[in-house]
Amino acid sequence: MIDDDGYRPNVGIVICNRQGQVMWARRYGQHSWQFPQGGINPGESPEQAMYRELFEEVGLSRKDVRILASTRNWLRYKLPKRLVRWDTKPVCIGQKQKWFLLQLVSNDSEINMQTSSTPEFDGWRWVSYWYPVRQVVSFKRDVYRRVMKEFASVVIAFQEAPPKPQSAPAWRRKRG
C-alpha cells in the first residue's frame, strides 16, 4: 500500500528497558543496525501493525511490553535512488512512519529473533538512548533524531520515577 505521494505507511518501534537503554537490532546477514519497523497492512491500525511487527521481528507480544508513547505525527524519509524499485507500480520512494515507544516489562529472554521463516534480524543489544541516532544508516538519521527527541522526556521521566512502593501484606498492615 503506497500513498499518493509515493510513501509506504509503516510503524517504527523503540523498545526501552528499565535503565532507559534501547534495543538495537542487527539486520539479518548484514552489518547494519536499526529499530524494528514494518509496513501497515490494509485495514490495520498503526497500533495493530506495531503489535504484529513486534512479534514477527523480535518475538514479543502485548504481555511483554507497555506502550509509553507514540509520535504525534507521521514522519517520512526518502529512500536513496539506488534503493527505489522503479519497475514496480506504484513506485515507493520512501516510508511514512508512526513510531511507538515501548517499555519491556518481561525478561530479555523473551526476545526471539527467529519467529519467522525469513527473520529480519539476527542479533540485538541494549545501547544508550542517543546511540542509534549516530549509528543508523544516513537516510534514516533525521527521522531517528526526531523520534528520539520526541520520546526523550518520556524516557527521562520513566528513568527518574521512583519505584512504586510495595504495599505491606494485609496481615502486616496496622488497623485502627
Curated annotation (Swiss-Prot):
Name the residue ranges of motif: Nudix box: 38-59
> Where are the membrane-spanning stretches?
none
Molecular functions per Gene Ontology:
mRNA 5'-diphosphatase activity
Q: What keywords are assigned to this protein?
A: Hydrolase
One GO-annotated biological process of the protein: mRNA catabolic process
Entries under Pfam families matching the protein:
NUDIX
| Broad class of enzyme this protein falls into | hydrolase
> Matching PROSITE patterns, A to Z?
NUDIX, NUDIX_BOX
Q: In the Enzyme Commission scheme, what number(s) does this protein have?
A: 3.6.1.-
Entry cofactors:
a divalent metal cation
Q: Which GO cellular component terms are attached?
A: cytoplasm
Functional note: Accelerates the degradation of transcripts by removing pyrophosphate from the 5'-end of triphosphorylated RNA, leading to a more labile monophosphorylated state that can stimulate subsequent ribonuclease cleavage.
Question: Which family does the record assign?
Answer: Belongs to the Nudix hydrolase family. RppH subfamily.
Would you tell me the protein name for this molecule? RNA pyrophosphohydrolase
